[in-house]
């Protein structure tokens, strides 16, 4: 779901925009829909090498509201400082997530689907056993999005046999993705997880990892 700041500003009185934005993001998260906040995020950087403090707060608040991504438009397409704009936005996002990820509001409703219940249980188990990673096998991306919306601070990796889904996961909060072969048995899934994590130097023998799958293999 795109949330265009300028469109809300046209359709609503300005004083209503912040609350409507927060509610829109919350609603999308509840239904496991990715949210991209866009338009005029760092508008002043079209002609200035530094953003205004209000713009910095706008970008940071998009993260704290629970958005998956933010998007630049005129700042990089016609602006005088496209590289600096991207660098500054990245710094704002990284700093906000590093210092304020625990301030992102939790979902206010209980899961209504089997997939939602499984991902919630997986997060609770992972946090209880202090797992190093949560690994999600998905063919459509739905399980990864349901996991992402819970905003766990444990690193999450989505394994998928679909390259288009792997690319799409780059816009899902907190999800790294890996392309794997389609397998016929859960033991093969565990082998793929071991091969990826150990091969990338991300885990070692004895590390705990929670693995879930959106559908049975085969």
Label for each model-derived stretch:
Residues 4, 40, 62, 147, ...:
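Conserved, mostly hydrophobic/aromatic
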Residues 30, 89-123:
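Long, charged amphipathic helices and adjacent flexible linkers at domain junctions
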Residues 12-27, 79-89:
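Active-site-adjacent beta->alpha loops and helix N-cap segments on the catalytic face
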Residues 3-10, 59-82:
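Glycine-rich phosphate-binding active-site loops on the catalytic face of alpha/beta enzymes
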Residues 190, 194-196, 204-217:
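C-terminal binding/interaction regions
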Residues 30-48, 131, 152-156:
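Short beta-strand/loop segments at the ligand-binding rim of alpha/beta enzyme cores
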Residues 1, 43-65:
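Catalytic cores of alpha/beta
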Residues 143-145, 151-189:
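Nucleotide-binding motor/catalytic cores of P-loop/tubulin-like NTPases across gene-expression machines
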């Amino acid at each position: 779901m795109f949330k265009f700041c300028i469109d809300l500003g046209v359709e609503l009185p300005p004083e209503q925009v912040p609350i409507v934005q927060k509610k829109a993001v919350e609603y999308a998260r509840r239904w496991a829909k990715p949210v991209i906040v866009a338009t005029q995020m760092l508008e002043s950087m079209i002609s200035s090498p530094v953003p205004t403090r209000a713009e910095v707060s706008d970008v940071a608040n998009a993260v704290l509201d629970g958005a998956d991504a933010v998007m630049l438009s005129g700042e990089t397409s016609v602006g005088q400082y496209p590289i600096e704009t991207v660098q500054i936005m990245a710094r704002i996002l990284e700093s906000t997530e590093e210092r304020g990820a625990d301030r992102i509001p939790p979902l206010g409703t209980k899961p209504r689907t089997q997939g939602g219940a499984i991902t919630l249980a997986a997060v609770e188990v992972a946090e209880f056993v202090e797992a190093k990673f949560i690994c999600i096998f998905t063919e459509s991306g739905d399980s990864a999005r349901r996991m992402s919306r819970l905003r766990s601070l444990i690193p999450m990796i989505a394994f998928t046999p679909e390259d288009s889904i792997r690319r799409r996961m780059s816009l899902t909060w907190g999800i790294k993705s890996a392309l794997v072969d389609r397998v016929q048995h859960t033991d093969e899934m565990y082998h793929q997880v071991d091969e990826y994590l150990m091969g990338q130097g991300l885990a070692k023998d004895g590390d705990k990892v929670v693995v879930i799958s959106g559908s049975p293999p085969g």
